[in-house]
């Protein structure tokens, strides 16, 4: 999860988030190299006589500054398209969870089970226990099995919402009348926090998301106790 004064991304917990982190570093390095080159040329022009006021045509230079940006864009686009395809592809999910956004809470339905559904509200600050996180804890966590592909079907009952869990690389819009989907896969057990990431009204900041990823055996025991 995030912590105060954090500069980088949250620790990756899913394969998708690991890919996104690597792509971020890849793109950031390209931006850094381009910025360094531009600043170097500007400094040379300001401190030396590196100017050609009489040059009217330079075919070689024009060719270079046309081809080079195209190559750079390809180096960015190819890994981006690969990750986009990975995020969209869902192969044989073991579980499907339907998520509905409301003003201002989330409701969840495990479609593979009968009568396994609940609402998830933020716990008010006055009701928090020692060690719990303000504005991030909920009364009913979403319990899911780890290391298995899970499909989330996401929509909304009223206005636009966005279901986001940064450490899993998830951010999917919840749109009334439309069903979006996302893949959830966690490499390790634990609690993973998120929030609504679309301004949806006065209590927008009070719509936390808590995923509890557990081994399959514990998930089966939990689901049996909930039915």
Curated annotation (Swiss-Prot):
| Pfam short name (any one) | COX2
Q: Where in the cell is it found?
A: Mitochondrion inner membrane
Per UniProt, the keywords (alphabetical) are: Copper, Electron transport, Magnesium, Membrane, Metal-binding, Mitochondrion, Mitochondrion inner membrane, Phosphoprotein, Respiratory chain, Translocase, Transmembrane, Transmembrane helix, Transport
Protein EC: 7.1.1.9
State how the cofactor is bound: Binds a dinuclear copper A center per subunit.
Q: What class of enzyme is it?
A: translocase
Q: What is this protein called?
A: Cytochrome c oxidase subunit 2
């Amino acid at each position: 999860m995030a912590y105060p004064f954090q500069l980088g991304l949250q620790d990756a917990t899913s394969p998708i988030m690991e890919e996104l982190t690597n792509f971020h570093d890849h793109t950031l390095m390209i931006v850094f190299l381009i910025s360094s080159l531009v600043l170097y040329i500007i400094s040379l022009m300001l401190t030396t006589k590196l100017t050609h006021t009489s040059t009217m045509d330079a075919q070689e230079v024009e060719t270079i500054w046309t081809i080079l940006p195209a190559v750079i864009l390809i180096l960015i686009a190819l890994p981006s398209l690969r990750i986009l395809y990975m995020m969209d592809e869902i192969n044989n999910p073991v579980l499907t969870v339907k998520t509905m956004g409301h003003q201002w809470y989330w409701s969840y339905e495990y479609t593979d089970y009968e009568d396994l559904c609940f609402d998830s509200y933020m716990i008010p600050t006055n009701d928090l226990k020692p060690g719990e996180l303000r504005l991030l804890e909920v009364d009913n966590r979403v319990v899911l099995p780890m290391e298995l592909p899970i499909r989330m079907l996401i929509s909304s009952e009223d206005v636009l919402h966005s279901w986001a869990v940064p450490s899993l690389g998830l951010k999917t819009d919840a749109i009334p009348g439309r069903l979006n989907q996302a893949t959830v896969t966690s490499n390790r057990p634990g609690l993973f926090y998120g929030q609504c990431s679309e301004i949806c009204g006065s209590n927008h900041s009070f719509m936390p998301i808590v995923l509890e990823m557990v081994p399959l055996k514990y998930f089966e025991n939990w689901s049996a106790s909930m039915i």
